[in-house]
């Protein structure tokens, strides 16, 4: 029994030392990463090649064994000839002049604070660097909106394409509401699925106030400001009617800026009719001029593959270990809020 007790004590010491070393190592790595700029990675995926391979695999699967054998032999010969031709061109220093126009496909699945704009800005910069005449951009967008400044920046990033006269199509399969629509309206063309949620051109803000609860517990709160409207409404302090009025005024000003922006992007839109904060399904949004066409992103991309090379560009942020945990928690919270929002905004089926 005494031997077992000594062994347990020895084991506990070993575990303590190992944990202490691991903690110190983690702190050192974290500090080193914090001081080092975290550069991401640009990933380019050829969707045209993927579609071609999928089509060929399906065709081969429908053949009998003899046909498959002949097909594989022909494909092997074809690929060998293509590789040989490419090698010969490279050896002679020839540059391909018959390249097809490209369709650059970007993705934006927005969270409440629109932090995905950090990747979007890099993707757009990459597209601008490689863009050639006859190319175009398709953005697959999904967002219920969020922080004004975050989505304002995201819309401004898309504006960079518009300023360069680069054709931009935004596709909405599920939702592009509020800040999401602020981004979508920058496009030359908006394509929506029939039951995607579109619109919600409005501004909302809400917060609880715990002042009466704190007073009932004899807890005093002091709030000192320099500037008459440094704080309008607070969580803990006592709100005044003057503060509430100023807060509503700021909301209305933000709403007007939102309306002006949408009107500038889509001049033919009856902004007063659609800027009520309401949302509509895609097939209703077409009638109101909020979107231009009813279709899915899949069909849009497939239709553009004829005579073009379709390429998906993604900028992947490198994350520290601690950021991965906090990021996962934030994404879970965003998904939960989105689920509640969707349930409250539309009937269930």
UniProtKB/Swiss-Prot annotation:
TM annotation in the entry: 9-29
Cytoplasmic side stretches: 30-349
Topological region Periplasmic: 1-8
Keyword Transcription regulation: no
Record-level GO cellular component terms: plasma membrane
Enzyme class label: hydrolase
Active site annotation, chain numbering: 178 (nucleophile), 230 (proton donor/acceptor)
A Pfam family hit: Peptidase_S49
Bilayer topology term: Single-pass membrane protein
EC numbers: 3.4.21.-
GO BP terms: proteolysis
Gene Ontology MF terms in the entry: serine-type endopeptidase activity
Family: Belongs to the peptidase S49 family.
Protein name, entry field: Probable protease SohB
Protein's organism: Escherichia coli (strain K12)
Taxon lineage: Bacteria, Pseudomonadati, Pseudomonadota, Gammaproteobacteria, Enterobacterales
Gene name for this UniProt entry: sohB
